[in-house]
């Protein structure tokens, strides 16, 4: 099996780290604009399977030429703007593709992908990704669903949350700030509730949950849960559906005030040379929120479900992972990158056999995927408890 990994950033590094240990993988080519960085990183792995190449993904010809190199599958860890160009190039080259971004930009490519016999699997990271598999499994356990909540988080491990924000960066800081002003939708009492981006941290939209070993965490709406009610096939029966971000206590109150003061605004300030408040926050806070080499991040996924004809009292699925200090891989890297790499193998081996634009909800088999995660030290724990009531 020959695998192409696009991007050697935080997630691409984890994909390559995982792939080179697999005896069924003949070679891994990692392509990045910063090829020297990729070469240095690959050299540290000490694997003859891994090779670095330079690529400008914004150049359609260069992308097409690279994908024509005889690969079985490409794992795309590039920024969101490259999702469609990579998918189109993969279809043209007859190469399967996996990415970790939302699928909105490529849904219309289902027909061309099917015609080419190509599987394109988006949303295959952590959130979205593993959370969607957990949600699909929870839904399968009931005849009909009345309540479904999904929680996702990347926060410092207990003890390493020792700065004023109780937060550090294991993803892109710009992406985190953008998510803090992204409109959300939830289903509450059977009705779709629209939440403007400036109000996602308002008290009326949040609640708290207890997660071991973190204690009480705040939950704020994250993205479009109503959309996923449709995709899970529960829109006609569910009275409560939500997707939430978890943070340590105090986070919501602080960001609620900063948002109200305009610190996440995207309008340039002429007196400051056209810098936007959001850009200032990215550049000023980013360097101050990094992890030290001996500090750990943590990833949390929780899915809570309740319904008819399933486990009495409801069902909760939990995933908690921490940074591996030996490899240096953050929990965020591990869960996003390993999930994408596992799915890439499953497509080539026909464990995932669909073609076209696929979905983790519909097309990724639960037990083989969970088993593969467990081999990497990542477990999903089931407990017999459903969602608590939200006022």
Label every model-predicted segment.
Residues 141-391:
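C-terminal catalytic/substrate-binding lobe primarily of soluble NAD(P)-dependent oxidoreductases
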Residues 61-62, 73-90, 103-106:
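Beta-loop-alpha module in the N-terminal Rossmann-like domain of NAD(P)-dependent dehydrogenases
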Residues 45-59:
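Rossmann-fold cofactor-recognition segment
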Residues 100-122:
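Rossmann-fold NAD(P)-binding glycine/threonine-rich loop
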Residues 3-7:
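Conserved N-terminal Rossmann-fold NAD(P)-binding element of oxidoreductases
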Residues 11:
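Hydrophobic/small residue at the entry helix of a nucleotide-binding pocket
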Residues 57-71:
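Conserved Rossmann-fold cofactor-binding substructure of NAD(P)-dependent oxidoreductases
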């Amino acid at each position: 099996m020959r695998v192409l990994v696009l991007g050697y950033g935080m997630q691409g590094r984890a994909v390559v780290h995982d792939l080179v240990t697999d005896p069924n993988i003949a070679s891994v080519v990692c392509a990045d604009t910063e090829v020297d960085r990729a070469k240095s990183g690959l050299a540290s792995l000490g694997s003859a399977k891994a090779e670095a190449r330079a690529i400008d993904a914004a150049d359609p010809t260069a992308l097409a030429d690279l994908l024509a190199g005889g690969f079985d599958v490409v794992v795309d860890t590039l920024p969101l703007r490259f999702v469609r160009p990579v998918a189109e190039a993969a279809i043209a080259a007859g190469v399967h593709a996996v990415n970790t971004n939302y699928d909105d930009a490529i849904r219309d490519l289902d027909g061309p992908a099917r015609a080419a016999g190509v599987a394109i699997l988006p949303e295959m990271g952590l959130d979205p990704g593993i959370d969607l598999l957990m949600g699909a499994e929870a839904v399968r356990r009931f005849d009909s669903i009345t309540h479904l909540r999904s929680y996702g988080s990347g926060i410092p491990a207990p003890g390493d949350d020792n700065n004023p924000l109780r937060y550090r960066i294991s993803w892109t800081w710009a992406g985190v700030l953008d998510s803090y002003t992204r409109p959300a939708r939830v289903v509450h009492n059977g009705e779709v509730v629209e939440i403007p981006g400036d109000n996602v941290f308002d008290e009326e939209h949040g609640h708290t949950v207890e997660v071991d070993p973190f204690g009480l965490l705040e939950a704020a709406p994250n993205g479009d849960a109503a959309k996923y009610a449709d995709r899970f096939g529960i829109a006609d029966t569910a009275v409560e559906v939500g997707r939430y971000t978890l943070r340590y206590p105090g986070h919501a109150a602080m960001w609620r005030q900063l948002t109200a003061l305009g610190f996440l605004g995207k309008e340039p300030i002429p007196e400051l040379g056209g810098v936007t408040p959001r850009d200032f926050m990215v550049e000023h806070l980013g360097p101050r929120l990094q992890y030290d080499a001996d500090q750990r991040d943590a990833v949390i996924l929780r899915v809570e479900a309740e319904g008819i004809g399933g486990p009495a009292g409801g069902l909760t699925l939990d995933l908690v992972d921490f940074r591996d200090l030996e490899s240096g891989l953050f929990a965020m890297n591990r869960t996003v990158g390993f999930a994408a790499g596992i799915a890439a193998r499953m497509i080539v081996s026909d464990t995932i056999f669909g073609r076209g634009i696929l979905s983790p909800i519909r097309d990724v088999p639960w037990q083989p995927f969970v088993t593969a995660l467990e081999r990497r030290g990542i477990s999903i724990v089931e407990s017999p408890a459903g969602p608590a009531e939200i006022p």
